[in-house]
Structure formats: C-alpha cells, structure tokens
Swiss-Prot record:
The protein's role, per its UniProt record: Transfers a GMP moiety from GTP to Mo-molybdopterin (Mo-MPT) cofactor (Moco or molybdenum cofactor) to form Mo-molybdopterin guanine dinucleotide (Mo-MGD) cofactor.
Cofactor(s) needed by this chain: Mg(2+)
Name of the protein this chain belongs to: Probable molybdenum cofactor guanylyltransferase
Domain notes: The N-terminal domain determines nucleotide recognition and specific binding, while the C-terminal domain determines the specific binding to the target protein.
Length: 200
C-alpha cells in the first residue's frame, strides 16, 4: 500500500461550462491531462474519476487509470468520486484535485502532503477565507464516513468535514499562492484564465 495517492475528479456534468471541462484546452493539452501531469511530479499513484460519457476520450489524454463512480453511487457528486478512487487505489492519504483548477502547482501537493498527520482525518486549505475541500487531503479512514453519508443520501463536502477531525491550513501560512486554487466554472472564467496565462 502506498502512503500517498492522487484522485482527480472529472465526473461532473459541467452544466455551467456547456461542455466537459476535463477536455477543455489548456497549455496545448487538456485540463485533465495537465492536472495529471502536475500531480505526477509529486504522486506516483493517480486515478481519474470520469463521467461515463467522456471516459474513452479522457483515456486518450492520460497515462493513468480512468474509472467511473462505483455503480451504486454513480452521480452522487464529489463524495462518490472520492470514495471510488479510494477503493481503486489503496493508500494512507489521498490528495484530491478537481479537473477545473488548472493553475494548480506541483508545489501545492508537496505542501499539502507535508501537512498530513495521522492524528487528523483531513487537511483542508483555507484560501482567502474560504475552505477548499476539493483541493485537500483525506486519510483512508474517511472512506467509511463517506459510505455512511452516501447511505443517508447526504452528498455535501461540508457534511463530510463536519464528521472529520480536520486540520485547516491557511494558504498564507504555508506560502500557497491563491491563484493555484482558482476554479473555472464558466466560459467567461475560462477566457479570463487563458488571458492570465498568456500574460504570465
């Protein structure tokens, strides 16, 4: 069993974006391929959780396993994706990454995993005053908590955090750049992110 593994969440419907965000172009590749490469600098074991409709296309872009949600919990949001990844790869800790934060740096995963401590169930950054539970790390014991929530048809990350012993980490305290955590939810945000990229 490895100590650390990565789970990339690419199973959302991207309704506000209008097309699958995982396959949006970024730095001459796709969001999902870019994020897997960034994670791969720090983590050897990575799995991508994909929506059924795009799984075959995602597989063309990444050199890591691409799976769907556990059938019983398919479509139950990020909790289903996280627990599906935990079932696929055995590890002590899992770094979670959504496919729509393309600015993330490999430095973040080094910082995040350095903060893990078995006293805690989760390590969650707080960036500009906001919790970022999808750019966080979770201990494998959280798997049972997720199953219990899904059994009760509870799907929110907040409900999971309320049941965990969480180590909250201020981005400023660990020299994390707030830009790493920017989400791209709409085409307008995508255009702005592309502009910011070309201005770097």
């Amino acid at each position: 069993m490895s100590k650390y593994a990565g789970i990339v969440l690419a199973g959302g419907m991207s309704s506000r974006f209008g097309e699958p965000k995982a396959l949006a172009i970024w730095k001459e590749t796709t969001f999902v391929e870019h994020i897997v490469k960034v994670m791969g600098n720090t983590l050897q074991d990575i799995v991508v959780i994909s929506h059924t409709d795009i799984k075959e296309r995602v597989e063309q872009f990444v050199q890591v396993p691409v799976i769907e949600d556990i059938p019983h919990y398919k479509g139950n949001g990020p909790l289903a994706g996280i627990v599906s990844g935990m079932e696929y790869i055995e590890a002590d800790w899992y770094a979670i990454m959504p496919c729509d934060a393309p600015n993330v740096s490999h430095e973040w995963f080094t910082i995040l995993l350095e903060q893990t401590n078995n006293e805690y169930d989760a390590v969650v950054p707080i960036i500009n005053g906001r919790k970022q539970p999808l750019l966080a790390a979770y201990h494998n014991r959280v798997k049972e908590k997720i199953y219990a929530l899904l059994q009760e048809e509870k799907r929110s990350m907040g409900q999971l955090l309320s049941q965990c012993n969480v180590k909250y980490v201020s981005g400023e305290d660990v020299q994390a750049n707030a830009d790493w955590f920017i989400n791209v939810n709409t085409k307008e945000e995508y255009v702005q992110a592309q502009k910011d990229l070309s201005n770097e």
